[in-house]
A protein has these predicted regions:
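Residue-identity detector for glutamine
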Residues: 2, 69-70, 75, 144, ...
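Cysteine-cluster motifs in flexible loop/terminal segments that predominantly coordinate metals
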Residues: 123, 128-175
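Mg2+/Mn2+-dependent nuclease catalytic core
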Residues: 16-125
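A non-catalytic, helix-rich entry segment at domain boundaries
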Residues: 1-13, 20
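Short alpha-helical "patches" and their helix-cap loops
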Residues: 2-4, 87-93, 163-170
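Short secondary-structure boundary segments
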Residues: 1, 20-29, 145-155
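Surface-exposed loop/turn and secondary-structure junction residues enriched for glycine/proline
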Residues: 4, 19-21, 112-119, 137, ...
Length: 175
């Protein structure tokens, strides 16, 4: 895909941006690549690399959900910037081989292209929820299976010793 801003869109901490009018939130993301199909639709492409024993052929693990949300956010950003974007994006997964005798100054990869049909319909309501949470004086309830909530509670307990005069719940992070 040829576009004058392509290098900016690939750059971390710049990327493609969109200010959400209903919330005023600035959403941005740095895309890895963009392919174009015969219908002139853009396909968002995200490169991933790892070194796992098993062959990667699908994004079917719980921790892949973040990858999918990232793809859908990129699709949403390009749509909001006026581009015709296909629902299908691609993950190009490079899995470094572990079974070589020696590296000999090079890594060998098995590369798999994984199509993914994105659905960015969750993004608008999520931005509204984020705005509401940011403007609230209350922390959201801890979710049962949320790794971030567990981390927040752990950090809160550690930080409590720096605020000994405050009762639990009187500060940020739930401390």
């Amino acid at each position: 895909f040829q576009h004058p801003k392509m290098n900016i869109w690939r750059e971390n901490f710049k990327g493609i941006e969109y200010r959400h009018p209903e919330t005023g939130l600035l959403v941005s993301g740095a895309v890895d690549d963009i392919w174009v199909n015969d219908k002139e639709e853009l396909h968002i492409v995200d490169y991933k690399s790892t070194s796992k024993d098993e062959k990667i052929e699908a994004l079917d693990k719980d921790w892949h959900d973040g990858y999918k949300q990232q793809m859908e956010t990129y699709q949403w950003l390009f749509r909001r910037n006026g581009f015709k974007v296909s629902d299908t994006g691609y993950f190009v997964y490079a899995n470094a081989s572990k079974d070589r005798e020696a590296f000999d100054a090079k890594l060998e990869f098995d590369v798999t292209v994984i199509p993914y049909k994105g659905d960015d319909s969750w993004l608008e309501p999520t931005l509204l929820d984020i705005k509401e949470t940011l403007e609230s004086d209350e922390l959201p309830a801890v979710a049962q299976d949320c790794d971030y909530c567990t981390y927040r509670e752990f950090v809160g307990r550690k930080l409590q010793r720096f605020a000994p005069g405050k009762k639990k719940g009187q500060g940020t992070l739930g401390i």
